[in-house]
């Protein structure tokens, strides 16, 4: 079974993580905030979308290096402005065999680089499989 780690579990990452878990993949969700991680573990409900309930198999952690190293597929669901910092700080946790899927939206403001370009820059072009999944923005009804 494929193992997937989501870096970021906001509304977009959370929805995708739930879907992949329901499709049979082993999913770990990383969030930098331990209080959010504890809420997710304790309630199995998303902190931004209470009607989003995670299956029992989804794991939650704030240990990013362990989450990266234990997975085959890394899905980047963090704000595009945070990608460079997060990847740079955790570069040693990645290996060239990871499949990296970017689902973050936008470009890096300071450089005008796409997330794929930022990843190539930070990871020195050493990763064979870097892809981007894009789609509509999720809007909340008012």
Write out the residue ranges for each language-model feature:
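Rossmann-like NAD(P)(H) cofactor-binding subdomain of soluble oxidoreductases
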Residues: 61-64, 69, 73-142
């Amino acid at each position: 079974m494929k193992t997937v780690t989501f870096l970021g579990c906001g509304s977009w990452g959370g929805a995708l993580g739930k879907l992949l878990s329901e499709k049979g993949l082993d999913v770990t969700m990383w969030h930098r905030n331990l209080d959010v991680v504890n809420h997710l573990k304790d309630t199995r409900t998303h902190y931004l979308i209470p009607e989003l309930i995670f299956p029992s198999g989804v794991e939650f952690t704030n240990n990013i290096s362990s989450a990266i190293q234990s997975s085959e597929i890394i899905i980047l669901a963090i704000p595009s402005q945070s990608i460079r910092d997060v990847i740079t700080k955790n570069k040693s946790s990645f290996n060239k065999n990871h499949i990296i899927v970017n689902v973050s939206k936008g470009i890096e403001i300071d450089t005008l680089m796409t997330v794929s370009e930022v990843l190539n820059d930070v990871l020195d072009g050493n990763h064979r499989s870097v892809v981007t999944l894009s789609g509509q923005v999720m809007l909340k009804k008012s």
